UniProtKB/Swiss-Prot annotation:
This is Sulfotransferase 1C2. It comes from Mus musculus (Mouse). The gene is Sult1c2. Sulfotransferase that utilizes 3'-phospho-5'-adenylyl sulfate (PAPS) to catalyze the sulfate conjugation of phenolic compounds. Does not transfer sulfate to steroids, dopamine, acetaminophen, or alpha-naphthol. Except in mitochondria, where it can add sulfate to cholesterol producing cholesterol sulfate, which alters mitochondrial membrane organization, and impacts protein complex mobility increasing state-III respiration, thereby modulating mitochondrial respiration. GO terms for molecular function: aryl sulfotransferase activity; cholesterol sulfotransferase activity; sulfotransferase activity. 3'-phosphoadenylyl sulfate binds at residues 49-54, 131, 139, 194, 228-233, 256-260.
Amino acid sequence: MALTPELSRQTKLKEVAGIPLQAPTVDNWRQIQTFEAKPDDLLICTYPKSGTTWIQEIVDMIEQNGDVEKCRRTIIQHRHPFIEWARPPQPSGVDKANEMPAPRILRTHLPTQLLPPSFWTNNCKFLYVARNAKDCMVSYYHFYRMSQVLPEPGTWDEYFETFINGKVSWGSWFDHVKGWWEIRDKYQILFLFYEDMKRNPKHEIQKVMQFMGKNLDEDVVDKIVLETSFEKMKENPMTNRSTAPKSILDQSISPFMRKGTVGDWKNHFTVAQNERFDEIYKQKMGRTSLNFSMEL
């Protein structure tokens, strides 16, 4: 059956505590909030389009001791359940997580205040990756364009306003990143920067390895650096979402793995938008000790 625009795009976002989320996620909120984390869970946390798939593949390669074939056992979105995912009649992210044996590696885009409380009470490990706001905004725009489960983003200029006002799915980039940054010393949180991962992947991968309590030989780490490069992952059907149905991701509009660079925002921001964004950034982020690289 051909998908009509009404069926192909679930355009409505709903809110939980002022945070816009996809409607099926909000409809399934009770199951998400009562999710039972386990003490040995590792939760990968990101704002959308901040290197989620990249860090997932790095973590999986470390967990599998650099065994490429084991990392190809299934597509990446099946390896690490996305806890807030809900799209009936498919099993929810919570359903999939509950079926997994321990130790589990899970993922989320939720801000700190919406995370199921059991993650905090069980003192789980959290791996957070932050990406500079300008590149994140651009990447999320192209994802919005191709995603069939998010609202139409409109023109770049229209989307620019939506993003800076925190009206995109999962809410404000500013609040999300600040929220995780401010609690990084209170819990077992490894806070990484996308730009550092691009600048020196081996160094950042070694940090992840130590955080996971693994000790791999240098040649294995070098192999992980190679296998998790953007070029390799873009061609890997286990990571490039090429198996996702067009009714969810339409990659004829924009590829899921598009550029993976630092500084692509310069190809989208007008001078006026850049000046305005910098002013908003100062207002929202001026009191934090967070520092991002806008280019390499």
